[in-house]
Amino acid sequence: MHWNPFLFGFDSNLKLVSILEKEFIFYRNLESRQKIYFEKRVDKFIQNYSFVGKEILVNYEMKALIAATYVVLTFGMRNYRTTMFNTIIIYPSTYYSTINDTYHKGEFNPRMKLIVFSWEDFLSGHKVKDNINLGLHEFTHALLFHALKSKDASAMIFHEEFNFVVKYFDNEDFLNALRVKNYFRAYAYTNKFEFLAVLLEHFFETPNVFKSEFPELFERLKRMLNYKEIQ
């Protein structure tokens, strides 16, 4: 039995709808009832998480783009919200982190319950389909942390499929085959956590190529996210 979000009323926010129609192919491809579901989740995200600008004024469109990126990633999950972060900090561009004395484009800090983005890099990742998407990347880290800590059904499936992904990562022959294909960027092979984050960037940015080149791995990620392909 599937939970039906459409049993509950929700009035569409016209400003939000305009942003989603313009900026998200994923949203445009949904059926009308699914669009309402998507809008409701974006609206709830904006209401439930704090957005803090550092040397930048955060407007509604910025919040909507960030929230919708998270909703794209979690759209198939019944339990999609997480307590692994409560605040999203936005810098105009790359920022200096005192934690490891280096410049960052983005990060997930579970101890401080923060997601941090360089807006310049977030926007570039959103606009350009080059398999580099900062929003998807950092939110994947947060979702994995949630999956490792939580016992809800969505988290358990995510965790279970991550364990399969780790088996791929630990298989040196398989990794060598991936490197030969040169589809995933080198950063994917840093560790198993970055491997998953990069995989999901590719999953959403160039799904047809991913599915064609690595169908078994693609199916694992579909199950992980309870993702339904748009025909």
Language model features: what each stretch is:
Residues E31, K129-A147, A197:
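Active-site recognition of the HExxH zinc-binding catalytic motif
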